[in-house]
Amino acid sequence: MGQAHITKHIFVTGGVASSLGKGLTASSLGRLLKARGLRVTMQKLDPYLNVDPGTMNPFQHGEVFVTDDGAETDLDIGHYERFLDVSLDGSANVTTGQVYSAVIARERRGGYLGQTVQVVPHITDEIKDRIRRLADDSVDVVITEVGGTVGDIESLPYLEAIRQVRHEVGRDNALTVHVSLVPYLAPSGELKTKPTQHSVAALRSIGLQPDAVVCRSDRPLPDSLKKKIAMMCDVDDEAVVGAPDASSIYDIPRVLHREGLDAYVVRRLGLSFRDVDWTEWDTLLRRVHHPANTATIAIVGKYVDLPDAYLSVTEALRAGAFATDTRVDLRWVTSDECSSPDATATLLDGIDGVIVPGGFGVRGIEGKLTALRHARENGIPTLGICLGLQCMVIEAARSLAGLEAANSTEFVPETPHPVISTMADQHEVVAGTRDMGGTMRLGLYSCVLAPGTLAQREYGAAEVAERHRHRYEVNNDYRHRLAAAGLVFSGTSPDGRLVEVVELPADVHPYYVGTQAHPEFRSRPTRAHPLFRGLVAAAVAHADRRRGMLPVDLPSEDAPTPENGVPENGAAQTRGVTAGRSGGSIRRGASASRPSVSSNGTAALVSP
């Protein structure tokens, strides 16, 4: 009889400070183990009391990452999916709100048979059950990241649950990796290990002895400091891993492998493995560091002061850049600042592409509409995502279809032309008579693409599936009028009732596409999403024309309207114009107050 399969557990904790990059460390380790032939899944334990991040302010939490099954999760789940090239489900993100809700609901049903319900054992048992639920025969390793920092009150039940899991599965089947900060003090010119020593001491006081320590720093750690940390924290010398800032987040697996973390883990857990297969990742790194092309793309959004609010968008854009061998310089543009056509022209000067991402609420909407009009009229490749599609429809209704008061019922409930309206099953939510959290149109839905359209060409398929997160949709009462004005409805739900993709014809604009979905959630660094790849390719072509001052065919300002002679397919007369001059690569809007972010992530997510 064969030996029973035993799933191994790796727990990743953090100390000294938040935002050290536990998620990227865990993701990179997962990538290394998968490259060694192991089957890996990942999970994030979040100590906040929200059931999920769906109703959180983007400025507080960053983006909400949506899984195939419609779960609204932490942005680290996006890192897990991108680095491992897998699709996770809602079980990958556990929150204190979920845990307490489940325990209290069970108590109300009489599930505890009159017991006094307590943090230990009932809350910790629920946490353990959610950890162990992932450990089935299809998985060799479960990597579980604990959110927050050791010493936080709200993290204590999770750390106690991990201690118990280690005891129950056996020391040979569980391993704890502690990510800690080793700061550099400029006045003394020294890296200091004392914060890490105290952090490990705090972890040990809870009953958890780390097996490995990943030391985050802004420079490499000398071997003498590694030995000191090993001695003072009671871990093996080879288990102290230096993790200095990297030039790209995609360098982190190489850094951790060079430090020997993955080799130590597989040996410590007794895992069968092969050597790391770097074929795919090395190809990626070559494109990260040695691209052949360049282009500048603006993200016109409401939450640009916190780039994490658009994390998957920027990573999908970088993946599109890698796929086209391009370095993309990002320019962050606050939609509020696009207050007039002249201001917008200044902010978007020298731009080769525009992304209008998702969001909620009326603030900044008029600025997005102005930016979209500028991009449409000047032939700048543009991708609208979720709210971006809705803004494209509103702008087309106003500028092309002559519906000057067109709007969304989200912004102006009594608008005379609601070209964007509340979905039928969302009216009670909008009215406040039904819960807001977890009630949007969430998860994976199919989309049928019209033959011969740009969207169908980019996808290379007649039907695709994308993840969604929205309450509003294109109003079908206006579809015929908008189509007559030149807007192409190139993708719909299989029943044809819900608009999924809009675009302008290729003879009117080189790349002007909007999707109601969130395609960024299905992009991978080694497998770019078609819409982002297409946007970058179009932006590179635009950049080449702009730098060469070559003629660009654009719709004529006095082209006929649908009422006076434009063919039904929306084709318009074009005129030759000269593209604007090149702008600098370090821009935030019109100023240099924020560095641009290259497609390799150099100026943003540079630490594991």
Swiss-Prot record:
Name of this protein: CTP synthase
Enzyme Commission designation: 6.3.4.2
Subunit structure: Homotetramer.
Binding site for L-glutamine: 359, 387-390, 410, 471
Pfam annotation, one family: CTP_synth_N
Activity regulation remarks: Allosterically activated by GTP, when glutamine is the substrate; GTP has no effect on the reaction when ammonia is the substrate. The allosteric effector GTP functions by stabilizing the protein conformation that binds the tetrahedral intermediate(s) formed during glutamine hydrolysis. Inhibited by the product CTP, via allosteric rather than competitive inhibition.
Binding site for Mg(2+): 76, 145
Reaction(s) catalysed by this chain's protein: UTP + L-glutamine + ATP + H2O = CTP + L-glutamate + ADP + phosphate + 2 H(+); L-glutamine + H2O = L-glutamate + NH4(+); UTP + NH4(+) + ATP = CTP + ADP + phosphate + 2 H(+)
GO cellular component, one term: cytosol
PROSITE patterns: GATASE_TYPE_1
GO BP annotation list: 'de novo' CTP biosynthetic process; pyrimidine nucleobase biosynthetic process
Organism: Frankia casuarinae (strain DSM 45818 / CECT 9043 / HFP020203 / CcI3)
Species lineage: Bacteria, Bacillati, Actinomycetota, Actinomycetes, Frankiales
